Structure formats: structure tokens, C-alpha cells
């Protein structure tokens, strides 16, 4: 026999359960970028590269052969060369890389932009090097945060970037008995506020040039093609960003090119390659170009040395005449508006 149950008076105003009191704890926001050596010498670069290249998200095959290559060859040869590259862009005043300087500034400006929400605390960290994600989480908890929004500073998702930030953030939680609640912002590769900020930054930069570029190259960080073949959505998100940027700027695929930079090792990476494309453009008679790096939230070694330095030299050595790299969004007003909107959207329900 089925019993009839009345819900008419189950939650009348007189016997309704009281709403839980609003939390008086603070909410943390942790901006996270890739990382940087602590010093611009071979020793500092070696420590950084060992941590970076030992991450299974970055180099998926961490077998014996890779360990021999990494410890026997790469860490004995590459640090000296990369140290010179870092020295060429190093912030000597603060004795740190530009990436660290800019990420700190982004954190400070975002904190100021959220000043009317006094219970929100903003800090920053690096996936590799210092300050670490663990230090960031510990610091926010020490300031009374029981909820933390982790913000990977990568517009386009990749397992080698965004996912490893998540891995490390949640690994840190495994060491804690009293854990904060964690959220992670999603990729924002197709958000209107991001595309608009990119477009404005390009338009404003072009106004400062004494020439009109014949075309613009949009250069994204590369990755092994094998990773995409296995299901990483990174390439399709780079394509989506580029197509939206073309639409916003009124350019087609002959005027705004999509390329991939920073390949490493001997396997096939995503193509077309930035350096090969720029070399061919110059050899084909293109004299004036600009390069934008939409996937980088802050200028770093890959933008300041690889693009503004190496690729500029490649272009001019092969017949090009005018080359300019559009600064990343950094802590500019448009760049900070991207972070402000992203964070406020993802903090809904916590504020």
C-alpha cells in the first residue's frame, strides 16, 4: 500500500529552516602563469628547466630514455644558451624576469579593481619556479580565504598549460586536512571581452608605427602534433581565436596569418611554424609586417626574445625591412579588463 504524504505544510514560513549565515571568510583569487628562473644564470635556468621538463603534462613520455636525454644532455647544454637569452630581457632593476614583473602588476591592479569587495584577496603564482602555487594557496589561506579561484593565465586550454596548473593546485590540497574550496576559470579564447581587448591592442599599436604592415602574423605557442592528435583542444581554440580576431579587425586569412612558435625537440609540432613562415614572407618580397601573440597573457622570453629578437632578425636577414611585435595585453587597461570580467564572472555565487 502506498502512503499519501502531504507537503502542504512541510516548509511553511513558520517552520522553514533558517538560511545559513553568510560566510565571513575571505575569497582568494590566484593568478597563475607558466614560470621563470629565479636568476638569469645557467644555474637558475637549470633548476627551472628540470622542473618544467620533468612535468608529465609537458613531456608525456617520462621514461628512462627521456631521463637520460634530460639529465645527460639538455640540462648540461641548454641552460647556458637560455641564460644568455634571459639576460637579454632581464629586468635588472628588480633582478627578475619581465614575466614575474608583469604578473605581479596584474595581481596588484586586479586587487585595486576589486577593492570595493574587501573580502576578495588577489595573489599570484607560477606553475614552475617561484612563487609556487603551494605558496600562493598557503598565503591566501593564511589571510582567511576558505574559497580560492585559480586563474590559469592561458586564453586557450592545453593539457601542457592549464591542466598542469589544475594538477598542481589540487595536489597541494592533498597535503591539507582543512581544505579550501577550489574553482578554476575556464579558457576564454572566444570571449567577447578578450577578442575586443586583443583588437584594441593591435589597433593602438599600429597607430604608433611609422609604416603600415602588409599583413599581421598571429603567433601562438606550439605543441607536439601528437598531443592534438590524442585529443588536446588547443589548436582548435587557437584557430577560433584567430577567426574571431579576423572578423573583428575586418581581415581575411591572407592578412592575418596563424602560426605556431617555440618548437622543441625533433618531433613534428603544430604548423605552420612561425619562424619558417616569417622567413618565407621575407623571401617572397613582403617588406613590412607586425606580429601579435594572442596566447600569451604577459610578455616573456618567448615574446620578447624569440619573436622581437630572433624572428625579427630572421625577417630582416631574408629581405624584410620593417618588423614590429605587438605587446601582450600585460597589465594594460584592456588586459586588466579581461581579467576583471573573467574573475567576476567565475566568482558568481561567492560574492
Curated annotation (Swiss-Prot):
**GO CC term, one of those recorded:** cytoplasm
Q: Which GO terms describe its biological process?
A: heme biosynthetic process
Q: Which Pfam families match?
A: Ferrochelatase (PF00762)
Q: Which Gene3D superfamilies match?
A: 3.40.50.1400
Does the entry feature the keyword Cytoplasm, yes or no?
yes
EC no.? 4.98.1.1
User: What does the similarity note say?
Assistant: Belongs to the ferrochelatase family.
Q: What is this protein called?
A: Ferrochelatase
Amino acid at each position: 500500500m502506498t502512503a499519501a504524504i502531504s507537503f502542504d505544510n512541510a516548509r511553511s514560513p513558520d517552520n522553514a529552516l533558517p538560511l545559513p549565515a553568510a560566510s565571513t571568510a575571505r575569497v582568494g583569487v590566484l593568478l597563475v602563469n607558466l614560470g621563470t628562473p629565479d636568476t638569469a644564470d645557467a644555474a637558475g635556468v637549470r633548476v627551472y628547466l628540470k622542473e618544467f621538463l620533468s612535468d608529465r603534462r609537458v613531456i608525456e613520455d617520462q621514461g628512462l630514455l627521456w631521463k637520460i636525454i634530460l639529465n645527460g644532455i639538455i640540462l648540461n647544454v641548454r641552460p647556458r644558451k637560455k641564460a644568455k637569452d634571459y639576460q637579454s630581457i632581464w629586468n635588472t632593476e628588480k633582478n627578475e624576469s619581465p614575466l614575474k614583473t608583469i604578473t605581479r602588476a596584474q595581481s596588484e591592479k586586479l586587487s585595486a579593481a576589486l577593492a570595493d569587495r574587501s573580502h576578495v584577496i588577489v595573489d599570484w603564482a607560477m606553475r614552475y619556479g617561484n612563487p609556487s602555487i603551494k605558496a600562493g594557496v598557503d598565503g591566501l589561506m593564511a589571510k582567511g580565504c576558505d574559497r580560492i579561484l585559480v586563474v590559469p593565465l592561458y586564453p586557450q586550454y592545453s593539457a601542457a598549460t592549464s591542466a598542469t596548473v589544475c594538477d598542481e593546485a589540487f595536489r597541494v590540497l592533498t597535503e591539507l586536512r582543512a581544505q579550501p574550496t577550489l574553482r578554476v576559470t575556464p579558457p576564454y579564447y572566444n570571449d567577447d571581452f578578450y577578442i575586443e581587448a586583443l583588437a584594441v591592442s593591435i589597433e593602438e599599436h599600429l597607430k604608433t608605427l611609422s609604416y603600415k604592415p602588409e599583413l599581421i602574423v598571429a603567433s601562438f605557442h606550439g605543441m607536439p602534433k601528437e598531443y592534438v592528435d590524442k585529443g588536446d583542444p588547443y589548436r582548435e581554440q587557437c584557430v577560433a581565436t584567430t577567426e574571431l580576431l579576423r572578423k573583428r579587425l575586418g581581415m581575411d586569412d591572407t592578412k592575418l596569418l596563424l602560426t605556431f612558435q617555440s618548437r622543441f625537440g625533433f618531433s613534428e609540432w603544430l604548423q605552420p611554424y612561425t619562424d619558417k613562415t616569417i622567413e618565407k614572407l621575407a623571401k617572397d618580397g613582403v617588406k613590412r609586417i607586425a606580429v601579435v601573440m594572442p596566447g600569451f597573457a604577459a610578455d616573456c622570453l618567448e615574446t620578447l626574445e624569440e619573436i622581437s629578437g630572433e624572428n625579427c632578425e630572421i625577417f630582416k636577414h631574408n629581405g624584410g625591412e620593417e618588423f614590429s611585435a605587438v605587446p601582450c595585453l600585460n597589465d594594460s587597461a584592456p588586459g586588466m579588463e579581461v581579467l576583471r570580467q573573467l574573475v567576476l564572472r567565475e566568482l558568481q555565487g561567492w560574492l
